[in-house]
A protein has these predicted regions:
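Ribosome large-subunit tunnel/peptidyl-transferase-proximal elements
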Residues: 2-163, 167-188
Length: 188
């Protein structure tokens, strides 16, 4: 039997473009169509093509809102202080609202000007996402969610499922969002 080194195993995951998500026990049934396979108690394999497609579609969707000068309300659960500060400065520069998920409560949209507004939830748990979805539906505000497999994919206007537990995956999403908002658009 051939002995496999740890680095070669890590490289095989990276180069095979497999996205590893939560175990099947924590997966909402609405996300089964994006799974390639699973190990009952360990992890699920997310189809990388569906993930890349939903990510690309999301940023095209976001660009249209940016071009039309919509306001954004970000509700985040970013544990790393460096990533939070970095994203906070991007939001502050663009005058977008940034709220922590821990600060959310029922009725948070009632006192806000919501005309031409989009809510984006980033890395929230499914309970917070569902609370925000109810508010967004009542106020008729589009909701975009970056969340894991535990959330119902129909809980948002646009849902991007993935494994956002690591620093690198969170950094990637926040960097892509920052780039999307920093681009110069022909119509602006």
């Amino acid at each position: 039997m051939k002995n496999i080194k740890k680095n070669s195993l890590i490289n095989s995951f990276i180069f095979s473009k497999i996205c590893v998500g939560s175990s099947m026990a924590y997966t909402d049934p609405t996300n089964f169509n994006v799974l390639l396979g699973y190990r009952k108690s360990l992890f699920a394999l997310i189809n990388p093509f569906s993930f890349q497609s939903s990510l690309k579609t999301c940023f095209i969707f976001l660009e249209s809102f940016v071009k039309n000068k919509y306001d954004f309300i970000f509700i985040v659960d970013i544990k790393d202080s460096i990533l939070f500060d970095k994203f906070y400065h991007v939001c502050k520069k663009k005058q977008y609202t940034l709220l922590k998920g821990s600060e959310m409560s029922t009725g948070f949209l009632t006192n806000k000007k919501i005309l031409n507004t989009v809510i984006i939830t980033i890395f929230l748990n499914h309970k917070k996402t569902e609370l925000i979805q109810k508010e967004a539906l009542l106020m008729n505000v589009p909701l975009i969610s970056f969340s894991d497999l535990t959330s119902n994919k129909f809980s948002s206007s646009f849902y991007i499922t993935g494994n956002y537990n690591s620093f690198l995956s969170q950094n990637l999403i926040l960097t892509l969002l920052s780039i999307c908002f920093e681009q110069k658009h022909e119509h602006s």
